[in-house]
């Protein structure tokens, strides 16, 4: 009887080990990937931007703002996309943020959190973005069962806990300096997208301090509109290489700005 138990036990143990091995990647896959986008609303009064129409450049009005509620603003563009579903909006997690939107990808277990910062609070928007890039102050955001990818309640990792962080808006570092940079820890694996004018020059030092890697940023003047951001995110979701993601971003920018693909490739770059 003892001999039989040993012989039968071996396959049982093997089966259990095999099932455990399968369960580990499945459990990892069940955790949603998150993207946190920090948007500084365009503001004719408080930012050194080329003035735009008064309605588009009102930094206190996210609904009609150039970088948020307009056709190519982050909220409107993603809400109209066939790839994303807006599952929550209107939240104001802190005073500087006039609106928070949460989007769920329709086919992948990926969520996007987008925060619209009051135009006059652009410095805070940039500091919060850099802190997130450094992995600091992670935020937990609960998602209701009816709006989650799994059909059950889940919690999203945002800010310093997000998998990818992005900034979109005016390059405020052209107007002011930061007294200190958020410091990342060794082994920081965050990637960052910075859609702002000449961001590779102005954000280089603070981004190095965070330890994050620049996935897409810019070498010249640009329109930080959402089509470029979405195209880069599309590639990131598919686990494409940094160069492939940058190529997507450049192609999208050329499509809308008609600047020529060669010019878009010079403008939008990846890495240091």
Task: Indicate where each model-derived feature is located.
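Caspase-like cysteine protease fold
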Residues: 244-272
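Catalytic cores of nucleophile-dependent amide-cleaving enzymes
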Residues: 155-235
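Boundary at the C-terminal end of the N-terminal hydrophobic targeting segment
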Residues: 25-30
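Bacterial N-terminal signal peptides that target proteins for export
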Residues: 2-14
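Bacterial N-terminal signal peptides
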Residues: 12-23
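Acidic/histidine-rich, surface-exposed loop or edge segments in extracytoplasmic proteins
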Residues: 31-61, 106-112
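Functional beta-strand-loop-alpha-helix junction segments that form "active/interaction loops"
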Residues: 62-158
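A polyampholytic, Gly/Pro-enriched intrinsically disordered region
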Residues: 216, 236-245
């Amino acid at each position: 009887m003892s001999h039989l138990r040993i012989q039968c036990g071996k396959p049982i143990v093997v089966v259990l080990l095999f099932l455990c091995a399968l369960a580990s990647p499945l459990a990892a896959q069940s955790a949603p990937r998150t993207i946190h986008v920090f948007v500084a609303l365009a503001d004719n009064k408080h930012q050194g931007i080329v003035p735009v129409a008064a309605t588009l450049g009102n930094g206190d009005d996210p609904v009609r703002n150039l970088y948020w509620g307009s056709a190519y603003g982050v909220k409107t563009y993603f809400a109209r996309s066939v790839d994303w579903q807006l599952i929550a909006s209107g939240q104001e997690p802190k005073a500087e943020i006039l609106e928070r939107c949460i989007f769920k990808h329709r086919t992948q277990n990926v969520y996007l959190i987008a925060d619209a910062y009051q135009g006059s609070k652009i410095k805070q928007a940039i500091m919060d973005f850099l802190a997130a890039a450094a992995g600091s102050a992670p935020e937990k955001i609960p998602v209701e069962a009816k709006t989650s990818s799994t059909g059950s309640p889940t919690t999203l990792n945002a800010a310093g806990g997000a998998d990818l962080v992005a900034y979109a808006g005016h390059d405020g570092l052209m107007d002011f300096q930061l007294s200190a940079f958020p410091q990342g820890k060794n082994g920081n694996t965050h990637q960052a997208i910075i859609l702002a004018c000449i961001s590779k020059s102005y954000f280089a030092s603070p981004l190095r301090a965070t330890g994050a890697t620049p996935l897409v940023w810019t070498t010249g003047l640009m329109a930080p509109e959402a089509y470029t951001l979405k195209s880069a995110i599309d590639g990131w979701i598919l686990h494409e290489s940094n160069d492939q993601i940058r190529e997507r971003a450049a192609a999208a920018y050329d499509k809308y700005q008609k600047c020529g693909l060669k010019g878009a490739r010079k403008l939008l770059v990846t890495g240091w």
